[in-house]
């Protein structure tokens, strides 16, 4: 109940103050599960995404563990479907939670860059989103958010065509890492193709 009440209030707040406009809603998959991968420019991005997809698609966001630092905030974030991740280490507990939610037919919200971009430009992604997408086999829905989040200045949310990443085929840890980095780049390129962003540069 709290999720849907908060979503309704958030929908009104964002549409009145920031005139959020959604583009590409026809690309939203008709069936769950799937993973939403978005750029990250503002702390309100999860709310913008959550109110731009159908209410029946409750989105579970992976959020930095610092937000769960006290009893009240931990209770609140868990109630709205978020779960913690330690960004400083390989958090296998968070990855297991992500797998479980997808196996149960849920929708997962991820910011592959790991933190907000101060410039608005796309940053290099961590490999966690690609790993979860490959291991679960569910489609990735690319999302791009642009706009200043200032009063009456439009914020635009673009939804791209879903993509399914190929399976991993490797003989060593180095090959696995290389393939995950390539797939992470594919995710970021799918976000970067949404106007008016640009893809992060590839590094050889």
What residue ranges belong to the model's regions?
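Helix-enriched interaction subdomains in cytosolic or periplasmic regions
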Residues: 1-7
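Non-catalytic C-terminal accessory region of glycerolipid acyltransferases
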Residues: 94-204
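Glycine-rich, highly charged phosphate/nucleotide-binding loops
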Residues: 21, 90-94
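Catalytic core of membrane glycerolipid acyltransferases/transacylases, capturing the structured
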Residues: 6, 15, 29-89
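A short, basic/flexible loop-to-alpha-helix module at the beginning of a structural domain
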Residues: 25-27
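Short, basic, glycine/proline-bearing loop/turn elements
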Residues: 10, 79-84, 112-115
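Short gly/ser/thr-rich secondary-structure transition/capping motifs
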Residues: 15-23
